[in-house]
Amino acid sequence: MLLERLHKRLHAGSSRRSQENKDKNCKPEDALPIQPEAQHQTQDPQPLLNCDYDDMIAFDRNLSTPVFTPVMTPINNSSSNQAKSSDASYFPPYLNANRTRQNSASSLASSVSDFAQNFKQHTFYNNNAQFTSFTPQFVGLLLEVYQNTCSDPTITPFDTTNPPSGILNRVAKAAIQQSELQQLDIGCDRNSWLLTLVRQRLLQEVRKDGYLSRNTSLTSLPPPPPPQFSEMLRVPSPFVNADITDPIPLSNTNSNPNVSSTTSLTNTLNWYSLQRSNVSMKNRNGSSQYISELQPQPILARTNSNNSVSNSNAFSLLTPTPTTDSAFNFNIALLSRQRSNIISSPLASTRLPTANVSTEESSILPNESLKLKRDLLRLKR
């Protein structure tokens, strides 16, 4: 009995120990093994390629610097044969190569451009002291050669106020050759720039001549100022004068005018001549006239005539009368025209006598007509 009890106790103890050992040694199937954490290596930032973040492919999370795969490969245009054009330029590529020639002043014709050469040469002309050191004798010779060239019938007609470069070159060469033959002093050294300087000086002189001839023509003169302005400026107006005398001698050519009338005539006729200078004027054929004083011209004086058929115009006979005043101006014709309009008015026709004039009284007639004209002018004012 005792042996059986001992055996049961031993068997129960051993079974308990074996069960405990089984429980300790058993492992669950679902449990995963614990792995150590991965150690990340830090690296410097690397430049990205030309791509967008939306176009990237997934990368490995274990890497700190992912590798990007661009969808589009960049194209290198540096080896292309086309010229590089700016973003603001709208010209085609084949025109950009010639834009330097198109934008230059030398590509324009001489009738369009104010400068015959490019900007560098134009700056050289302005900065060079020899450009303005030509002697007046050489400048006169240059203009004379130019006038002879303009009057040459074998040359194709051109604008004389803006000649082309071929004419400038021809005239400059001829002027330099003539100055050498005549041993004329030019005023500057004879070097490689001489022909260019002479061409530029000729172009300046021709354009200045055309400008002065346009501004000094009779049609470009300003209109006469009003009487109040002429009194303020103390300028004798040719149309308004309190003590006006007839500047047109109505008597015979042998009669001498008074000193006072001559003085008033000179002041009246010099009203416009003070504004004019002695310049070279050019006509359409290219010939120039150096006008120092306007030549005297015959004046048409109006005298009374005996006309029994027509009494509408009492002063209808025109007789040319020479004048000796060298400062003749077109104001004389304007004065005579105004007087003729006043005399031909209805008021003048009622006041003028229509009696027959004999040969003996012809010498007295001009004095009476002067008085009548003065009265009519005072009434007209």
UniProtKB/Swiss-Prot annotation:
Residues 1-30 are annotated as: Disordered. Disruption phenotype: Accelerates the G1/S phase transition. The keyword Amino-acid biosynthesis does not apply. One of its GO terms (molecular function) is cyclin-dependent protein serine/threonine kinase inhibitor activity. Keywords: Cell cycle, Cytoplasm, Nucleus, Phosphoprotein. GO terms for cellular component: cytoplasm; nucleus. The modification Phosphothreonine is found at T65, T69, T73. Residues 1-11 have a biased composition (Basic residues). Induction: Cell cycle-regulated gene mainly expressed at G1 by the transcription factor MCM1. Expression is induced upon stress. Expression also depends on transcription factors on MSN2 and MSN4. Coiled coil: none annotated. Changing T65A: Impairs CIP1-induced growth inhibition. GO terms for biological process: G1/S transition of mitotic cell cycle. Interact with the CDC28/CLN2 complex. Acts as an inhibitor of the CDC28/CLN2 cyclin-dependent kinase complex. Stabilizes the CDC28 inhibitor SIC1. Negatively regulates the G1/S phase transition. Contributes to osmostress-induced transitory G1 delay. This is Cyclin-dependent kinase inhibitor CIP1.
